[in-house]
């Protein structure tokens, strides 16, 4: 890399490490709340103005109400019998991260796909910032292309890089600088 290197990890640099156990308690209780399919009282774990920042397809939700109306409700309408399974969690001061899956039944319309009744897995990663016992920020990556593939929709039209793994296409090589 030429030139100055960008600043790294600026958001978590000055985290208060004495808050690790408090953060753990908030996240564990919140995941239990999600598994109980709570919507109306989920504010127990989030500030009114918290930010939920998702990848394309998920969108960004500004505040608790948008999260409830534009994420939780449509998600629970599309997927029933949903169980969140964090496969790993990390805690560091006011920060927490997890990756895992939600096992669910596709029982409502999702991204234009009518209900199939299929049992699917929804993979995700979450990064949370907790202050004063509540989540203020949540960065989220949900693997919607994988969800849609399980429902018979290939968003990459056969050109996902898995085609290189299957030797169906040749992976391009970088140009030399």
Residue ranges of model-derived segments:
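Short, low-complexity N-terminal intrinsically disordered segments enriched in polar/charged residues
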Residues: 2-48, 156-177
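Short, solvent-exposed aromatic-acidic interface loops
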Residues: 139-148
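A solvent-exposed, acidic/Ser-Thr-rich amphipathic alpha-helical stretch
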Residues: 40-94, 101-103
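Beta-strand elements of well-folded, non-transmembrane domains
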Residues: 35, 104-106, 130
């Amino acid at each position: 890399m030429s030139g100055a290197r960008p600043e790294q990890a600026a958001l978590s640099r000055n985290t208060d490490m004495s808050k690790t156990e408090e953060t753990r308690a908030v996240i564990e209780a919140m995941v239990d709340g999600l598994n109980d399919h709570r919507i109306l009282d989920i504010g127990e774990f989030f500030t009114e103005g918290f930010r939920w920042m998702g990848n394309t397809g998920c969108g960004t939700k500004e505040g608790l109400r948008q999260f409830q109306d534009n994420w939780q409700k449509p998600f629970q309408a599309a997927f029933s019998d949903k169980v969140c399974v964090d496969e790993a969690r990390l805690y560091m001061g006011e920060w927490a991260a997890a990756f895992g899956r939600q096992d669910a039944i596709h029982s409502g319309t999702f991204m234009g796909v009518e209900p199939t009744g299929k049992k699917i897995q929804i993979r995700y990663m979450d990064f949370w910032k907790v202050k004063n016992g509540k989540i203020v920020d949540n960065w989220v990556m949900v693997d919607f292309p994988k969800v849609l593939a399980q429902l018979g929709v290939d968003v990459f039209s056969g050109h996902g890089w898995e085609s290189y793994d299957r030797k169906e296409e040749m992976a391009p090589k970088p140009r030399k600088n």
